[in-house]
């Protein structure tokens, strides 16, 4: 029946299946279909990618806002239960601890039961994917559902566990971008393109940051610094477009829900604009950056060492392998018990939410000077108008609570990063850096109670400005990024401290990048993800080492004149993804590349036996339609390690063949590059 055709009515007279003509209302259906085709042609004239970028930004903003809305209600319910349960310490302790324990156990169990790749931040995996490596299941839609549910439960624990959502949201946004890329391919009818896919994934990473902090500019720059060593200008513009759409939609939803009167910054500050800081304070901001850089080295080293310890220890490794919810519950009990307000939690402002932590830390006034002559009593409930009093306790000074917070949260944050749940780790270190800056600013305000005199004018010390600089410097040093300075400006709406904050971030990064890998690179090292290490410094001699010193000389080639039996033996005995194709066995002149999958399919179509004297060779298989690829890029024996590393990073390569006067003599892959860089960085001891 489908082979029968009729004539379409009208002037075109195009043949159509009779089944279409026999359907109900054929003329109306044809008109609607024609109208949709016309609309599609007009809309896609400007480029279909832009519509999918708008959809990406809007979808992620809706998910982010819906998650914030739901989590806010759940956190308020927990606080209400804690207040209304009475004065019994046992019941209040149980209401404070059982809640996060149950949520984290469910988050771990649910996400891990669906897919193990849903745990953690997700940024290290996204960073690996953007280099061209295919990681199975990391961009599947089932991983998206597990990540959303698990992350919602994690964030519902509030400041008790002290975790954020930046990393998982980058992962979620990249998953949405991958899905929209597949929809785009089917809609437009184009063949799948790896380049197009990577463009959308890069834009998705920027949207993930922008929809968390409603900060499009720093969102794009942060995603570039964290996840790319080289970045295309074309992706730069697309990332800004999608991130702006997401941030605008996020602000718009807040205005429509009466949470904001208009589009404004997330954290309100009121730094003076006339003379926000004096010239001598530049030295203090740089010193603060140096302190943050030193502490970030200790944090990254301790966190990575603790992860290695958990993997090496028999008990914890077995617990994490077989009973992840139990490990999550045990860690939650420890963290919740320490933050219990009537216990030691009242020395670390545990009754404040993470947003309230930042709002109080960015306060202009000096708490040390305000409480110098009087010690305010510890209120039974936080005063919404004086939340900064949560940092003041009669038994400790402001300095005592800030120092206690830094000491306790240092190892508590490290413990929280080991819990196998979907969670972000950027906001906790951002707050930790703000506390460092606040402590530094309070010390200066006591050292200079009247302010700094310069040019005949007295300028008071503002600890809130140092908290802002500390947040940007410490988080930037931990992640090896400079865009955290711009992020601090966007979330506070203040640019008056642009120069000192940027100088603090530069000082912190100068120290941290010299001694330790970033937080995300450390996770890549621990998880053993396929990722190229950086070549740091010129002293290691990467320009003097050539490809001939570290290439893989055991190269398996396929010659066009090779008999089919030998070709089959080569395919069976090796497991490489592609074979270099040479002209003849004697010449070994490299002429192309044949993929293993294509070669296996071609061999399967060949007959099982041949007549005597008629056995074909590889040339016959290629002539029958087995596709080959040209060698567009190859290395010579004199190419330096530094140039090879740059090529692999810039073009997202996995393997390159080495030729000498046209002859294939070896290959270089990530394995050889890693070994060569490791040998230069850590040379073997002389015997």
Swiss-Prot record:
This is Chloride channel protein ClC-Kb. It comes from Mus musculus (Mouse). PANTHER family: CHLORIDE CHANNEL PROTEIN 2, CHLORIDE CHANNEL PROTEIN CLC-KB. InterPro entries: CBS_dom, CBS_dom_sf, Cl-channel_core, Cl_channel-K, Cl_channel_volt-gated, ClC. It is found in: Basolateral cell membrane. SUPFAM superfamilies: CBS-domain pair, Clc chloride channel. It catalyses: chloride(in) = chloride(out); iodide(out) = iodide(in); nitrate(in) = nitrate(out); bromide(in) = bromide(out). Specifically expressed in the kidney, predominantly in the outer medulla and cortex. All nephron segments expressing BSND also express CLCNK proteins.
């Amino acid at each position: 029946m489908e082979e029968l055709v009729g004539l379409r009515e009208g002037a075109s007279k195009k043949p159509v299946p009779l089944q279409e003509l026999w359907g109900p209302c054929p003329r109306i259906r044809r008109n609607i279909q024609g109208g949709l085709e016309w609309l599609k042609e007009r809309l896609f004239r400007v480029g279909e990618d832009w519509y999918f970028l708008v959809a990406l930004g809007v979808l992620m903003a809706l998910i982010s806002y819906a998650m914030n809305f739901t989590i806010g209600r759940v956190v308020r319910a927990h606080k209400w239960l804690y207040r209304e349960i009475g004065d019994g310490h046992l019941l209040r302790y149980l209401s404070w601890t059982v809640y996060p324990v149950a949520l984290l156990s469910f988050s771990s169990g649910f996400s891990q039961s669906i897919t193990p790749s849903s745990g953690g931040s997700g940024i290290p995996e996204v960073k690996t994917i953007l280099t061209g490596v295919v990681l199975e299941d990391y961009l599947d839609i089932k991983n998206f559902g597990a990540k959303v549910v698990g992350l919602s439960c994690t964030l519902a624990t509030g400041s008790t566990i002290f975790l954020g959502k930046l990393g998982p949201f980058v992962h979620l946004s990249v998953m949405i971008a991958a899905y929209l890329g597949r929809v785009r391919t089917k809609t437009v009818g184009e063949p799948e393109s790896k380049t197009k896919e990577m463009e959308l994934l890069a834009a998705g990473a920027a949207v993930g940051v922008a929809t968390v902090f409603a900060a499009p500019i720093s969102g794009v720059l942060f995603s570039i610094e964290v996840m790319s060593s080289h970045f295309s200008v074309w992706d730069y513009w697309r990332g800004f477009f999608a991130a702006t759409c997401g941030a605008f939609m996020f602000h718009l939803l807040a205005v429509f829900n009466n949470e904001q009167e208009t589009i404004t910054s997330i954290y309100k500050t009121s730094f003076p604009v006339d003379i926000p800081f004096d010239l001598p304070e530049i030295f203090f901001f740089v010193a603060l950056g140096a302190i943050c850089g030193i502490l970030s080295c200790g944090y990254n080293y301790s966190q990575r060492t603790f992860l290695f310890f958990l993997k090496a220890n028999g008990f914890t490794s077995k617990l994490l392998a077989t009973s992840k919810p139990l490990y999550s519950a045990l860690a939650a009990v420890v963290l919740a018990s320490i933050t219990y307000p009537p216990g030691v939690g009242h020395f670390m402002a545990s009754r404040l939410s993470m947003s309230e932590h930042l709002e109080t830390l960015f306060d202009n006034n000096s708490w040390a000077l305000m409480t110098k002559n009087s010690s305010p009593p510890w209120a039974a409930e936080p005063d919404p108008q004086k939340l900064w009093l949560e940092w003041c306790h009669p038994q400790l000074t402001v300095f005592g609570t800030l120092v206690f917070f830094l000491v306790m949260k240092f190892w508590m944050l490290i413990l929280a990063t080991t819990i196998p749940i979907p969670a972000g780790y950027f906001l906790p270190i951002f707050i930790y850096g703000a506390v460092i800056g606040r402590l530094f600013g309070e010390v200066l305000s006591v050292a200079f109670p009247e302010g700094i005199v310069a040019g005949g004018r007295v300028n008071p010390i503002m600890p809130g400005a140092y908290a802002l600089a500390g947040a940007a410097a410490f988080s930037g040093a931990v992640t090896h990024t400079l865009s955290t300075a711009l992020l601090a400006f966007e979330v506070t709406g203040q640019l008056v401290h642009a120069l000192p904050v940027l100088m603090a971030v530069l000082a912190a990064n100068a120290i941290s990048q010299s001694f330790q890998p970033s937080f995300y690179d450390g996770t890549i090292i621990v998880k053993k993800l396929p990722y190229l290490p950086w070549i740091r410094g010129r002293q290691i001699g990467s320009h003097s080492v050539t490809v001939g010193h570290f290439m893989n000389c055991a190269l398996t080639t396929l010659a066009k004149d090779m008999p089919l039996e030998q070709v089959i033996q080569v395919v069976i005995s090796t497991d490489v993804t592609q074979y270099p194709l040479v002209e003849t066995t004697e010449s070994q002149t490299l002429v192309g590349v044949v993929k293993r999958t294509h070669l296996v399919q071609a061999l399967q179509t060949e007959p099982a036996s041949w007549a005597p004297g008629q056995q074909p060779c590889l040339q016959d298989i290629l002539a029958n339609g087995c596709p080959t690829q040209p060698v567009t890029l190859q290395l010579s024996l004199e190419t330096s390690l530094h140039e090879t590393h740059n090529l692999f990073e810039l073009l997202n390569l996995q393997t390159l063949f080495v030729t000498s006067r046209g002859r294939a003599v070896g290959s270089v892959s990530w394995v050889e590059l890693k070994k060569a860089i490791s040998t230069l960085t850590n040379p073997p001891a002389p015997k």
